[in-house]
Amino acid sequence: MKKTGGFTLIELLIVMAILGMLAALVGPALFGNLSKGQRSAAQTQISNFESALDTYRLDVGQYPKTLNGLVENDSGRDSWDGPYIRGDLPKDPWGNDYFYQPNDKDFVLMSYGKDGKPGGQEDDEDIGR
């Protein structure tokens, strides 16, 4: 009887075990970088919103009541010179709306992180000002 080339079941199990151990070691590092990238993207979007909001305030004299005021003239003022953001309002990297609350002289603008709720730690930590 002629022996054909191939792997035995034991050899395949050993290779699969080694691949599993490598995945267990490398996987968390890859997902950690993904999380850092999402947080960085949220910070960049918030900076873009801040610039657009400040430009809106220079034109209109106050901050918009909602972020939608950056893409549509919801102020009713002729001095509105938008849209101040191209296209639709972006969502945060986790698909949630940004939290925006204007007051007389400033505003609060935040991403609530992965869970979309105030507070939290690590991936769920709030990002913004």
State where each predicted segment sits.
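Short, surface-exposed interaction loops/tails
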Residues: 36-40, 47, 51-54, 76-78, ...
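Alpha-helix exit/C-cap motif
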Residues: 51-68
